[in-house]
Amino acid sequence: MPAPRPQRLVRSAGALVWRFTDPARVALPGEPIDPADIEVLMVHRPRYHDWSWPKGKTENGESLVAAAVREVEEETGQIITLGAPLTTQRYRLGGGQTKEVHYWVGTPVPEGHSSERLRAPVARAPRTEIDQTAWTSPERAADMLTRRGDRRLLADIVARAREGRLVTTTLLVLRPGQGLSPRVDEAGDTHASASPSASSGGSAATAEAAAPAKPRPAPTPA
């Protein structure tokens, strides 16, 4: 039986964002990837004098998926789409609080892609919070990270790359007679990224398409 969730819980979300070192290379689902062929996106926090992964607290009524995408954009300027979920980190804070951080694999949305038009503008984090960002190799990132939990997440990304599990796709399963909204049908968007508007009353299908890919059974005939 899982341990009970702490009463004083601070929920946060973030992503380990990666890209190929070769900008012309296209990611294919199930393709094994040499970790030397990718870079990961890190942020420097002057308050703690450390390098870490972009993340932050959820806002009122915000889903974890939307928070992860928003926080990455606030801290790095990158608009991303989320892939597979990673290990959730949990640790104690002062005052009897427990922090729970949910992470996903993230990839940058191509510049000028239609999904950018679905998002509200996001203000960048102040330099007192994040003063540097860096794309770096997984090998160098392992030396830069200071927290063991962050290094475990990096190890997961590296393992997924080697095993062909880094690139995933989203599968929408509709009940018989259920159709996509015109917004999604017309866009044909495979890079939809979650946004506060999508998570708080926007198109349900758009929000679903932005969520991490999960295996689902195929629909059965009615």
Model regions and ranges:
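A generic fold-level signal
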Residues: 8-10, 35, 96-99, 128, ...
